[in-house]
A protein has these predicted regions:
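Glycine-rich, positively charged N-terminal anion/phosphate-binding segment
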Residues: 1-5, 20-95
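Alpha/beta catalytic cores of nucleotide-metabolism and tRNA/nucleoside-modifying enzymes
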Residues: 1-3, 11, 15, 21, ...
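N-terminal small/glycine-rich loop or linker at the start of catalytic domains
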Residues: 4-16, 50-70, 103, 108-111, ...
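Hydrophobic faces of well-ordered beta-strands that scaffold small-molecule active sites
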Residues: 15-19, 40-42, 70-74, 97, ...
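Active-site beta-loop-alpha junctions enriched in small/polar residues
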Residues: 20, 45-47, 75-77, 102-104, ...
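Alpha/beta enzyme core
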Residues: 34, 83-113, 122-198
Length: 319
C-alpha cells in the first residue's frame, strides 16, 4: 500500500476525496472513509464566515472522530484573517488545513478569492506563509493549471507555495476559465511534480479506478484526488485499494448494494441534518448513485417529490 506523508500526518494510502461544496459533507465523507479513502476533504469554509461567527459556517465545521485524517479547506484572500481564523479553529479535530486557490465560482473570484489568487503570486506567498506560521498543523494548497490559457502558471505558483512552507500541493489540470469542462491537462501535474519537492496530488478527470492508475503513471504524482468521480460512487476508493493489492479492478457493486448504500447515506443525512434537510439534500445523491441503472430516468423524475425516508425506501424498490 502506497502511503503518503503530508507534514507530520501519515495517510494510510494516497487516495484523497476532494473538497466539493454541497457534496463532501459529514455523511458522504463517512461513506468514503468506510470504502478506504486515505484523506477526506471537507466542504470549503469561508475564513470570513468564521471571523463573523456565521452559523452556517459552524455546521460545515462538523467532524466525526471516525473520519480522521480529514482536511479542512479555507477560502479567503486576507492573510491576517485566514491565518488568525486558522489559529482559532486549530483545536478542532481536523488533521490538515488546506487553502483554496482553485474555486472558479464567480462570486468567490470577484472577491479575489479561490482561483483569482493565481493572478497574484505575491499574495499567494503572504497568505500561505502567514498561515504556516500561525498553526502547527500542516498547511496545503489546492490550485489550478492557471487562471486562463494566457496565464498558465501552476508551476510558478507551486514553487511559491513550497517556498512559503506548505506541506503539499494539489493541482487540478484545468484553468479557471474551463471550470469543469473540456479535458483536464495531466501534463501540467507532471510539470509541477518535477518542479517541487513537496508531495503533489493530482486532480481532474479521475472518474474510475483505471483513470486514477493512469494519472499516477503519466504524472508521477504522489497522491490522487478524486472529486466528481466519487459522486454516487464511494466504491472508487475500495476499487483502487483492491487494485493495489491484487493488480485487478473488482466488479462494480450490484443494484442491491447501491440501494443499501443510498439508504445508509439517507440515514446518515437524517442523523446529522434532520428529516427535512437530510432528505432534500439526498435527492442529488440519488441521481448520481442511479446514473446508468435500468429505470433510473423514471426514478430521477420522481425523486424531487420524496419528502421522507419511507418514501425514499419505497421509491428505490422500483429499481
Amino acid at each position: 500500500m502506497k502511503q503518503l506523508k503530508i507534514g507530520n500526518v501519515l495517510l494510510e494510502n494516497s487516495y484523497v476525496l476532494g473538497p466539493m461544496a454541497g457534496v463532501t459533507d459529514l455523511p458522504f465523507r463517512l461513506l468514503c472513509k468506510e470504502q478506504g479513502a486515505g484523506l477526506l476533504c471537507m466542504e470549503m469554509v469561508s475564513a470570513k464566515g468564521i471571523f463573523y461567527n456565521n452559523k452556517n459556517t459552524e455546521s460545515l465545521l462538523q467532524i466525526n472522530p471516525e473520519e480522521v485524517p480529514v482536511s479542512l479547506q479555507f477560502f479567503g484572500s486576507d492573510p491576517k484573517i485566514v491565518s488568525e481564523m486558522a489559529k482559532r479553529v486549530e483545536e478542532r479535530p481536523f488533521s490538515i488545513l488546506d487553502i483554496n486557490m482553485g474555486c472558479p465560482v464567480p462570486k468567490v473570484v470577484r472577491n479575489g478569492e479561490g482561483s483569482a489568487l493565481m493572478k497574484n503570486p505575491k499574495l499567494v506567498y503572504e497568505l500561505v506563509s502567514a498561515t504556516v506560521k500561525a498553526i502547527k498543523k500542516p498547511v496545503t494548497v489546492k490550485i489550478r493549471k492557471g487562471f486562463d490559457d494566457e496565464h498558465i502558471n501552476a508551476v510558478e505558483i507551486a514553487k511559491i507555495i513550497e517556498e512559503a512552507g506548505a506541506a503539499a500541493v494539489a493541482v487540478h489540470g484545468r484553468t479557471r476559465e474551463q471550470y469543469y469542462s473540456g479535458k483536464a491537462d495531466w501534463e501540467i501535474i507532471r510539470q509541477v511534480k518535477e518542479a517541487v519537492s513537496i508531495p503533489v496530488i493530482g486532480n481532474g478527470d479521475v472518474t474510475s479506478g483505471e483513470k486514477a492508475i493512469a494519472m499516477r503513471e503519466q504524472t508521477g504524482c504522489d497522491g490522487v484526488m478524486i472529486a466528481r468521480g466519487a459522486q454516487g460512487n464511494p466504491w472508487i476508493f475500495s476499487e483502487l485499494l483492491e487494485y493495489e493489492r491484487t493488480g485487478r479492478l473488482p466488479d462494480r457493486p450490484d443494484v442491491e448494494e447501491i440501494k443499501q448504500t443510498m439508504l445508509r447515506h439517507a440515514r446518515l443525512q437524517i442523523e446529522y441534518k434532520g428529516d427535512f434537510t437530510g432528505i432534500r439534500e439526498m435527492r442529488k445523491h440519488v441521481a448520481w448513485y442511479t446514473k446508468g441503472l435500468h429505470g433510473a430516468a423514471r426514478l430521477r423524475d420522481r425523486i424531487n417529490q420524496v419528502e421522507s425516508y419511507a418514501e425514499l425506501e419505497n421509491l428505490l424498490t422500483s429499481l
